[in-house]
Amino acid sequence: MKGRQTILRVGEMALVGALVAGCLSGQRELGVPLSLTVRAAAAAEAARVVRVIDADTYIMQSGAATYRLRLLGVDAPEQDQAFGPQATDSVARLLAPGRVVLVARAGLDLYGRTLGAVLLPTATVAAAGRPVPLDSLLVVRGWAWACDPNRKVAAWAAQQTDAQRAGRGLWKCGASRAVTPKSWRSFDSEIKRRYRVGCTW
């Protein structure tokens, strides 16, 4: 058992090295502004996926520690919101239980969740042999809004504009029909019911 753990740790260290070496190139290839994902890469660590809670919140494990990670840089639809289940399913396909990814932690939020960035290995996403920041991938696929690290000011990046124009993901019904998670949480049950009628996946 001890030998198996040693082999696993060596493999995780190799993955960290490969991801850190390629993260800058991977982000530039997507045309993403250099953000937390790149700045924190040197301090990143290998982590195993335990489960996906929703499109931007996951249970992760690093060593013996298990923690809840809130993905920085994006805001994805709530589970009871239009396109929420589809966004979560899209992420769950990328973050299968037991998969090892690179996580750059950046403190805690008001709810005690760990804030951070996630880099996907090349075996998970085809990106010319380079790792891909999960936050950027969600925006490109239309499953999240791009936002700054403190989640207060929307950053209408080129990827989000392209996703809107192409009608990908939550933009299927047009930008005017998309409701941000923050607005959704403020709605009462009657308003939510009205928004659930009409355009669906």
Question: What is the role of each PLM region?
Answer:
Residues 2-201:
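Small beta-barrel nucleic-acid-binding modules, primarily SNase/OB-fold domains
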